[in-house]
A protein has these predicted regions:
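Catalytic activation segment of kinase domains across protein kinase-like and atypical kinase folds
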Residues: 172-207
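A short, low-complexity linker immediately N-terminal to eukaryotic Hanks-type protein kinase catalytic domains
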Residues: 1-16
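ATP-binding glycine-rich loop module of kinase domains
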Residues: 16-18, 24-88, 95-144
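Short, well-ordered beta-to-alpha junction loops that form the rim of enzyme active sites
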Residues: 92-93, 176
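Catalytic-loop of the protein kinase fold
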Residues: 154, 161-182
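Conserved short alpha-helix within the protein kinase catalytic core
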Residues: 144-158, 162
Length: 207
C-alpha cells in the first residue's frame, strides 16, 4: 500500500502510516519517521487551503514559541508548518500511545481476538462465560494495568494542566486522542490548543 505523502513548508516530505486521532478540529497522523507526527487542520471535514487562512494559522503556530511553556514540558511542540495545508509537523515521544487505547469497544477487541492480537484471560472467560463482550472488556481492563495505572496517568495529567495554568495558560481541547501515555506518565499533543486564559478564540473548552 502506498503511503500518503505530506510536504512541510521547508520542502521536507513526510510519509504517514496511520491515523492516531481524528476529530472535529483535524487529523493527527503517525509518520514513517517515528520521531514525528503531523496534525492537519480541517474545516467542515475538508482541508483548508485559502492563502489568508494559511497565513493566519502559520502566525498563530509561530506565536507558540513566545508562550511561557517550560522547555522540557511533556507536550509535542510544532517544528514546522505544512505546505498548502493548515497544520504542522510535531516532535513525537517514542513509545507513547493515545489514551483512547484504554477504552476499546468490544467490537474492536473482538476483531483483535480473531486476528490473534488479543486474548481473553482464562479466569475472566470462566467468570463471564455467558457474556463474551463483558469478558473482552474486563480482560482489556486487566491487561492495561487496571485502575491503579489509570489513576497514576490521570494524576500526572492533572499536574501537567496545573503547571500550564500556573503560567496563565489553558489547554483547550482535552480528549482521549490528544492525551498520550507511557509508564504511567501523560504526554499532550496538539500544542496549538494552548492559549492564554484571557486570549480570544472561536471556541474554548477549559480543563
Amino acid at each position: 500500500m502506498e503511503l500518503e505523502k505530506i510536504i512541510d513548508s521547508e520542502g521536507n516530505i513526510h510519509k504517514t502510516i496511520e491515523v492516531l486521532g481524528k476529530g472535529g478540529q483535524g487529523i493527527v497522523y503517525r509518520c514513517l519517521d517515528k520521531d514525528v507526527a503531523i496534525k492537519v487542520v480541517l474545516r467542515d471535514r475538508d482541508f483548508i487551503k485559502d492563502k489568508e487562512s494559511l497565513k493566519q494559522y502559520e502566525k498563530s503556530v509561530l506565536n507558540l514559541s513566545f508562550k511561557p511553556i517550560e522547555r522540557h514540558f511533556p507536550m509535542s511542540i510544532p517544528l514546522v508548518t505544512l505546505k498548502e495545508k493548515q497544520g504542522y509537523v510535531m516532535k513525537m515521544a517514542e513509545g507513547y500511545e493515545p489514551l483512547k487505547t484504554f477504552l476499546k469497544k468490544p467490537s474492536v477487541l473482538e476483531n483483535e481476538e480473531k486476528d490473534g492480537i488479543f486474548r481473553i484471560n482464562n479466569a475472566i472467560q470462566e467468570l463471564c462465560k455467558d457474556n463474551h463482550h463483558m469478558a473482552l472488556s474486563l480482560s482489556c481492563y486487566s491487561q492495561t494495568q487496571g485502575l491503579r495505572s489509570r489513576l497514576k496517568i490521570l494524576t500526572h495529567l492533572a499536574k501537567l494542566l496545573f503547571r500550564l495554568q500556573s503560567k496563565g495558560l489553558v489547554y483547550g481541547d482535552l480528549n482521549l486522542n490528544n492525551v498520550f501515555y507511557k509508564d504511567n506518565s501523560a504526554f499532550l499533543i496538539d500544542a496549538d490548543n494552548v492559549r492564554y486564559e484571557s486570549e480570544k478564540a472561536l471556541c474554548y473548552f477549559y480543563a
